[in-house]
């Protein structure tokens, strides 16, 4: 193994969506360095922070029918019943909603909570309230998708926050997606809601920290637990 390969493997991968922002931060740092070493170092720190924000580390995802994994890194902010956004055409009645709040220090690449087919994809412009507020689910800019599985339909909604002003989606309607696969990204702080059938067994609690693609949120299966496989992505 070459030295270059060793160094490359030791570095945290950066998602391509971050390249323009990192480049801008580097240019600013170089410009500040011309006027002041102190200001230049602040610029370098900003560039490093920007790169870390767009980091995209590999994850080891548990793979078993019925398991629902966290779509985002962050903190469980709410677990309860709520009506899903109308544009998803998911249900007119309240469903189980698990909300994950992401701060600006979390990884912001979002991963599919289940394996299935993307039945619907819907973007809705809106406000930029604090994503930790309950009404952010209704009023903020959001991008939602419905994933159809053999057991049920699962709704996933990316919600913009105070700082986040751009939701990025990597998928299209009709495509198949595997649990733990990347489906989108929200820039600079936000929230992700997962909508599930009422009665789903929840395995997390409010305040708990989550890791996208790894933390198991719920179990949709009523069967006895079977052997769980794991996949790195």
From Swiss-Prot:
Pathway: Phospholipid metabolism; phosphatidylethanolamine biosynthesis; phosphatidylethanolamine from CDP-diacylglycerol: step 2/2
Active site: residue positions: 190
Catalyzed reactions per annotation: a 1,2-diacyl-sn-glycero-3-phospho-L-serine + H(+) = a 1,2-diacyl-sn-glycero-3-phosphoethanolamine + CO2
Lyase keyword on record: yes
Membrane topology note: Peripheral membrane protein
GO terms for cellular component: plasma membrane
Cofactor names: pyruvate
One Pfam match: PS_Dcarbxylase
GO annotation terms (biological process): phosphatidylethanolamine biosynthetic process
Keywords of the record: Cell membrane, Decarboxylase, Lipid biosynthesis, Lipid metabolism, Lyase, Membrane, Phospholipid biosynthesis, Phospholipid metabolism, Pyruvate, Zymogen
Pyruvic acid (Ser) modifications at: 190
PTM comment, free text: Is synthesized initially as an inactive proenzyme. Formation of the active enzyme involves a self-maturation process in which the active site pyruvoyl group is generated from an internal serine residue via an autocatalytic post-translational modification. Two non-identical subunits are generated from the proenzyme in this reaction, and the pyruvate is formed at the N-terminus of the alpha chain, which is derived from the carboxyl end of the proenzyme.
EC number: 4.1.1.65
Family that this chain belongs to: Belongs to the phosphatidylserine decarboxylase family. PSD-A subfamily.
PANTHER family according to UniProt: ARCHAETIDYLSERINE DECARBOXYLASE PROENZYME-RELATED (PTHR35809:SF1)
Job description of the protein: Catalyzes the formation of phosphatidylethanolamine (PtdEtn) from phosphatidylserine (PtdSer).
Quaternary structure and partners: Heterodimer of a large membrane-associated beta subunit and a small pyruvoyl-containing alpha subunit.
Protein name: Phosphatidylserine decarboxylase proenzyme
Record gene name: psd
